[in-house]
Amino acid sequence: YGSFGVFGNHDVTERLLGGFSVASQAKEMRDPRFDEFAKKAKIRILDDEVMLIDDAFYLVGRKDAQKPGDGTKNRIEPEVILSGLDKAKPIIVLEHQPKQLKELETSGADMQLCGHTHDGQMFPGNLTVKLMWENACGYLKKGNLHSIVTSGVGVWGPAMRVGTDCEICPITIHFQG
């Protein structure tokens, strides 16, 4: 089927100071090097797109909530992007930030796969991140939605982690019924 992905909030051209992004622009554009990398790596980016895979399940990729990277602040809402899908088939949502869990669940999504939080990256962020996100890292079941958030391998700001681990999270999915 291939490799699929979504862009995140730091995949735009932005000014950095000490590794931290500063002076956020209203209409940030995706850095073209990310598109080139994805193409060379044969990663299909789903940018507010839905794919039906092997007539068996849906893969939905959402634009980043904070910085879509296309010069807008818009992305398609869960109830719109999931409308018209056959809800008898599993619906897996790829999204950089673990947002809108309730909306995804009520719109029929079965699973949401995310990153973004770095699990706080360093102390005390590894403690406070849990106040900001319903699922800051790990697994959470909300109604019929399974939310999985990985701490990832990247960093934001200083190139270090304290109190969190880098991870690539293999997931095995078994469809029933």
Place the predicted regions along the sequence by residue.
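Soluble catalytic domains of enzymes that build or remodel membrane lipids, polysaccharides, and related
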Residues: Y1-G177
